[in-house]
Design a protein with these regions (language model features):
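Bacterial Sec signal peptide processing site at the extreme N-terminus
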Residues: 20-33
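Surface-exposed binding/hinge segments that line
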Residues: 22-23, 127-130, 234-283, 288-290, ...
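Aromatic- and charge-enriched surface segment that lines or borders ligand/interaction sites
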Residues: 31-53, 57-60, 64-67, 71-83, ...
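Long amphipathic alpha-helical scaffold segments
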Residues: 78-143
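N-terminal lobe/hinge region of extracytoplasmic solute-binding protein
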Residues: 117-121, 133-189, 222, 295
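Short, well-ordered beta-strand elements
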Residues: 132-142, 185, 195-198, 217, ...
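Gly/Pro-rich hinge or "lid" segments in bacterial periplasmic/extracellular proteins
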Residues: 156, 160-167, 173-175, 269-341, ...
Length: 353
């Protein structure tokens, strides 16, 4: 485990500038290693509490069923018991996995896996599409933050610079309704339908050229689950809807859910985060990173000089984007730039565009 975590624990020092504000130099570790251990303990305690609570409810429901006098009453209580049993199994599945975050050697990867690559899907996009130019659009208000997570980050503009840009582990083909490769080059499913194993594309890099690694997906959860951000929904979501993430090597990892689901590879496509960008991460994260956009795996990025506070935000196509020749991305992302100008009145936007 220490081999994977050491890089996150080294103190770093530098200065950054954002939207004309200078933030003082910091010198601190991220706290990642302690977080992983503490969060595993927290989840173990929480699961134990949930099981105790469900067992108590089960006793009450069984008594209620025995005391039921009508078929309708028995049917209702039986349905409640069925739902409770399902929840108990979900929690037991998680207890059996022992940890929320795990670090293992590649030799511990299950050998019976059948790997898929989705390369039999047809291309997406039109080969006749020409690249170049600027796509102009407008927003009515300037976002209160450009942070990806934390307080006020879930604004109407986040989709334009994050959700519609960042790449997932796999894509879902609009015609075949099958998975195709994205950040992951190959994937495999566990027999119980709860876990997806991923092999990252060795070519996958962030927009600053840094390689994407398995541990980045653990780090992506760390920055969302730590006490340094205000994100109650995300914290509750990942706590309840995910069971485990295991790193086997720099390019291989798995994600498990508490129970089997359809479209499993989409549900297990957890967010990644570039650790080198968050080496100032700490209690003042939301203020320090207020106007900073992290390196992306997608085709567009926001340069600091293209943030005109109160006026506009411009995305630029990543030079030498790692997926520019990818079968499923080569004919998309054609504009050189995407510019969003603040125009409060729709009628004015109609005149301009």
């Amino acid at each position: 485990m220490k081999n994977y975590l050491l890089a996150f624990c080294l103190p770093l020092s530098f200065i950054f500038t954002s939207c004309d504000d200078v933030v003082t130099k910091v010198d601190r570790p991220t706290g990642f290693e302690d977080f992983v251990s503490n969060y595993n303990d927290h989840i173990a305690e929480w699961l134990e509490e949930q099981m105790i609570e469900l067992n108590e409810k089960q006793v009450k429901l069984e008594k209620k069923l025995a005391d039921s006098e009508t078929p309708e009453q028995k049917l209702a209580v039986t349905a409640d018991l069925k739902a409770l049993t399902r929840n108990k199994q979900k929690y037991q599945n998680r207890i059996d996995q022992k940890e929320f975050f795990s670090f293992k050697g590649i030799e511990e990867l299950p050998q019976e896996l059948v790997w898929e690559d989705g390369m039999d899907n047809p291309i997406i996009g039109d080969p006749r599409a020409k690249k170049g130019g600027v796509f102009h659009n407008y927003i009515r208000d300037f976002p209160r933050t450009l942070r990806q997570i934390g307080s006020q980050a879930n604004n109407s503009f986040r989709g334009e610079i994050y959700d519609n840009i960042d790449m997932g582990l796999v894509g879902y083909h609009p015609i075949t309704k099958k998975y195709y490769p994205s950040l992951a080059k190959e994937w495999a499913f566990s027999a119980d339908g709860r876990t997806v194993f991923y092999k990252l594309d060795p070519k996958a890099t962030y927009s600053d050229g840094v390689k994407v690694r398995s541990k980045d997906f653990v780090f992506g959860l760390f920055i969302r689950l730590s006490d340094n951000i205000t994100a109650p929904f995300e914290k509750q979501y990942y706590k309840e809807q995910y069971a485990n993430i295991t790193v086997y090597s720099d390019e291989v990892f798995s994600v498990s859910l508490p129970e089997a689901k359809p479209l499993l590879a989409l549900f297990t496509s957890v967010p990644n985060a570039p650790p080198h960008f968050y080496n100032e991460y700490g209690p003042d994260y939301e203020e320090r990173y207020q106007w900073r956009v992290p390196p992306t795996t997608g085709a567009y990025t926001v340069k600091p000089e293209d943030i005109k506070k109160g006026r506009s935000v411009t995305l630029s196509r990543v030079k030498d984007w790692w997926a520019k020749d990818h079968k499923f991305y080569q004919y998309s992302n054609n504009a050189d730039k995407i510019s969003y100008q603040v125009i409060a009145e729709e009628s004015k936007a109609f005149e301009l565009f």
